[in-house]
Amino acid sequence: GDPAELITRYALPKLYKLEQEYGSFITGTIKKGFKKKTSDELKVTRKVFSVKGGLSSLTEALYKLSGKDSFILGVSDLKPEYKEGKFHISFSNSQNENITIIANKLITTSGAFSLDTLLTFIDNESLSKITNLKYANVVEVILGFKNWNGMNPDGFGGLIPSIEKRDLLGVLFMSSLFANRTPENGTLFTLFLGGMRKPEMYNKSENEIKAIVEKEFVSLMKPSEFEPELFKINYHKNAIPQYGIDSGERFDMVDKLENQYKGLIIGGNLKGGIGMADRIKQGKELAVRACG
């Protein structure tokens, strides 16, 4: 994101809380280190972890435990309506059958950009306070080497500050971060381009991206030769929401609409943080609200 536009209070609430309680982020970090921790806090570590088999293992496990019959996949022509305090959701399933479900509650976790075509029963003026949220497009590049010969990638990786004027946003050392991500002696990197800093990267061809990555990666990691066995490019549209100065207005409108349409619960990365941990935390909160 663009640091000049991000509002700490919304984008980094934990840092903002430290600043409010202790006067500054640095002072707060130091003083909190001496503060007596609860038994639950003592269980928390800062160790980076993932899921065996990748994050799809997590969603697959949730899918199975929740009961596959609870899900309808491959739907189209989704049209929710709000009538007499109920949600009437019409759609076509994967067999092109027309189905209507009547529900007391409706939960959305899609991006803000899709709500105007999804929640058509809400007036455009109100929804625009939510759908005007900016998103950064990101290009993800995965590099894999069977026999790495360059700087030792022992660590997390790093973000690249804008002052360096590079075309990369950052590099993650995936094979150091997570176990069993590569064959024995293999090395895996994930690179990011684009974002609010370099939005033009998203529109570049794969050949252009490859040329940029080779130049930047060789400069950063100093391999004796650049011949990755794996070179994969993924384009992610609307990847990262930008919590700017209008965020407070957006959050207020979410609350207003949820009060106006009883049973409507609006989630997703348009509120509550942008990271994976934020999504898991919010998922539990939404489930508790829906069951309440």
Residue ranges and their predicted role:
Residues 153-155, 173-292:
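Conserved flavin/dinucleotide-binding core of flavoenzymes
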Residues 71-73, 108, 266:
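A structural signal for the hydrophobic beta-strands that form the central parallel beta-sheet
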Residues 51, 134, 272:
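Nucleotide-sugar-dependent glycosyltransferase donor-binding/catalytic pocket residues
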Residues 1-80:
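Active-site/ligand-binding neighborhood in enzyme catalytic cores
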Residues 76-189, 194-203, 207, 215-220:
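Mid-domain catalytic core of redox enzymes
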Residues 68, 103-104, 261:
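Active-site acidic short loop of glycosyltransferases
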